[in-house]
Amino acid sequence: YEVVVEELFTNVQQLSMEVESVHLDGQQLVNDAVSMLDRVATTQLTDEETSYAFAHIYDVKANTEAVEEIVKIFMSRADTQKAANVTEKLAVLNDTIAYYEVGKEDYVNYSYFTSKQKEELIAAISDVRDALKEMNSSLK
């Protein structure tokens, strides 16, 4: 066991040193969140492929939660109005997602959505994406 413990200790020390040298750029992280939402709104939800439709809303919810965490981190560095706009748009998106929730953390299969429902969800995602872009331009 001593060899394994020593190797683990060495690896943890090395990782610790590497983590100290990582620089996270706020604007890049917010840009990544914008890109993530853009992919969902313009590719995933508009794709005619239905074999993964059962998972689309789960993916939208996970992406929304990730964006919320990024916004929490950088909200204090952004213009107050622009940050509030993102929060507002996220609330609308969360309400839209919640409408399709069935039970606890289960969702209606996206393939059952009407065209109008799909458009509403995509619009809510796009609104968050656009608000994030605006917030990102104001990061200090």
What are these language model-derived features?
Residues 1-140:
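Mature extracytoplasmic or organellar-lumen-exposed domains after removal of signal/transit peptides
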